């Protein structure tokens, strides 16, 4: 509620945005502190009343938080439109939303009107801290996720927060993987999620790490696009693919507007199946295995007959460019051994 404090906080964040090539600004737990409510704002509250302010003290505090959130979002977009702003609020909007949910009321106690920020679209991604298990009925992960998804009427990226501390054994890993698969089924286009915290992954958390690598994280993924920021994809790259030593496909590419590219994706097709690899903007070459051996059952064979190995070769290669907000270009495609440039299916 103190304007000088708000200005200083705003200026510090904007200084980082201006001077550094950041992807985004993240606020974790942005609200009044937990405690008994004795926040030391008597002076600014008195000044507000003397100036003719008509809000209750609770609404006045919430309004100060709302004003800062909106101001910061607009400031970031004016300075660098591609820099995302996201918040990770307490996971319960308010008790009773939806009806079965019980627990802490951040609106009344922390003066955080998180629901309003989402409704107004003052964020680019939304990561409510859904730190409760699937079967904890008063704070059920899927029930809360479904409610936030329904309330996301501005179509921002919904990336629920999942706590992984203390969940590194097999039982804990199953809980996290179940939450990920529920999120992928509940939320349109399965945009992703955020884990708290990275320290757990850096330790020897074999059950969790192994389960994620073998399950939901076995494939690379791109950050989802943010079409409200920009929905114009970059131009396709120029590419060439050649077979070297009958074992490797060497793919090279260039881009006329390389400064607009954040990632490249190289797709390659073995007969009917496409594979891909995601590379950084500085990369200009990829070496792909020209062949692979698969085991399949030949047509007409009976059950119990041994499966036969089959060698498949790369028949098409494609390269796309991805910009800072996640827009992917049309592909540049080459059919191996031919000069025809077909459409990527």
Feature names for model-found ranges:
Residues 111-137, 148-229:
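Substrate-binding cleft of secreted/luminal carbohydrate-active enzymes
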Residues 1-122, 131:
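Polysaccharide-binding and catalytic clefts of secreted carbohydrate-active enzymes
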């Amino acid at each position: 509620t103190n304007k000088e404090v708000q200005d200083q906080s705003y200026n510090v964040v904007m200084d980082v945005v201006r001077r550094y090539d950041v992807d985004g600004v993240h606020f974790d737990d942005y609200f009044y502190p937990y405690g008994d409510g004795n926040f030391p704002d008597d002076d600014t509250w008195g000044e507000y009343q003397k100036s003719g302010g008509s809000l209750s003290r609770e609404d006045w505090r919430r309004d100060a938080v709302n004003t800062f959130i909106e101001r910061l979002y607009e400031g970031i977009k004016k300075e660098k439109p591609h820099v995302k702003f996201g918040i990770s609020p307490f996971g319960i909007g308010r008790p009773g939303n939806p009806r079965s949910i019980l627990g802490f009321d951040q609106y009344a106690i922390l003066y955080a009107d998180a629901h309003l920020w989402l409704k107004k679209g003052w964020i680019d991604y939304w990561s409510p801290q859904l730190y409760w298990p699937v079967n904890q009925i008063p704070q059920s992960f899927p029930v809360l996720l479904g409610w936030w998804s329904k309330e996301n009427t501005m179509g921002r990226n919904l990336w629920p927060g999942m706590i992984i501390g203390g969940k590194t054994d097999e039982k804990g890993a199953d809980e996290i993987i179940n939450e990920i698969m529920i999120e992928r089924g509940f939320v349109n286009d399965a945009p992703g999620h955020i884990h708290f915290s990275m320290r757990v992954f850096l330790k020897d958390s074999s059950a969790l790490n192994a389960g994620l690598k073998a399950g939901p994280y076995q494939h690379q993924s791109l950050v989802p696009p943010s079409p409200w920021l920009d929905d114009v994809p970059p131009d396709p790259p120029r590419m060439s693919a050649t077979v070297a030593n009958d074992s490797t496909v060497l793919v090279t590419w260039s881009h006329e507007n390389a400064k607009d590219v954040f990632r490249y994706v190289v797709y390659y097709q073995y007969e009917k199946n496409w594979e891909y690899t995601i590379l950084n903007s500085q990369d200009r070459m990829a070496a792909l295995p020209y062949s692979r051996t698969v085991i399949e059952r030949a047509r007409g064979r009976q059950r119990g007959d041994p499966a036969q190995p089959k060698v498949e070769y790369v028949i098409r290669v494609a390269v796309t460019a991805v910009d800072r907000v996640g827009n992917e270009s049309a592909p540049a495609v080459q059919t191996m051994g031919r000069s025809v440039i077909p459409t990527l299916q």
